[in-house]
Amino acid sequence: MGAAGVIVLVITLLLGGCGFGAVQIAPYEPEPGTSGACAALSEGLPDVVSDAVRRDTEPAVPYVAAWGDPAVVLRCGVPLPAEYGPDSRLLEVDGIGWLPVDGEGGTFFTAADRAVHVEVAVPDDYAPEADVLADLAPAILDALPARNA
């Protein structure tokens, strides 16, 4: 295969999500009043997070995004998790306060200091998880104001 063929193959893989099918997501309804902010966030999300290429989701909805395999999954307009309380210690990554909650095979991070909450499920394969959160921070900061702003 010549150089042009390799370039076409690489572009095809990048645009096609590296050949992975769509990420199956559990349907949910975003919190009332969050759809506009979530749509704005979706517009600004990066194509690559921690070297993982963005993938389609099934169903395709504007408040969910996914990258890589295993998939990093972002859900916008979620409620704060039950683990959140007034004394919760947040993990600060690039200007966003995240509440980490351990799950099977990874960690769920919720942007608890935003007016609209975002959850990012990060599989253990992506350690350090802060790299994923740092890649998402600019889009979140642009689209979602701080909770008390």
Regions found by a protein language model. Name each.
Residues C18-A22:
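Bacterial signal peptide processing site
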Residues G85-A149:
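Extracytosolic low-complexity repeat regions of secreted or lipid-anchored proteins
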Residues V49-D51, V61-D102:
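Mature extracytoplasmic domains of secretory-pathway proteins
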Residues M1-G16:
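Sec-dependent bacterial lipoprotein signal peptides
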Residues I7, P27-P30, T34, D125, ...:
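Generic alpha-helical structural element
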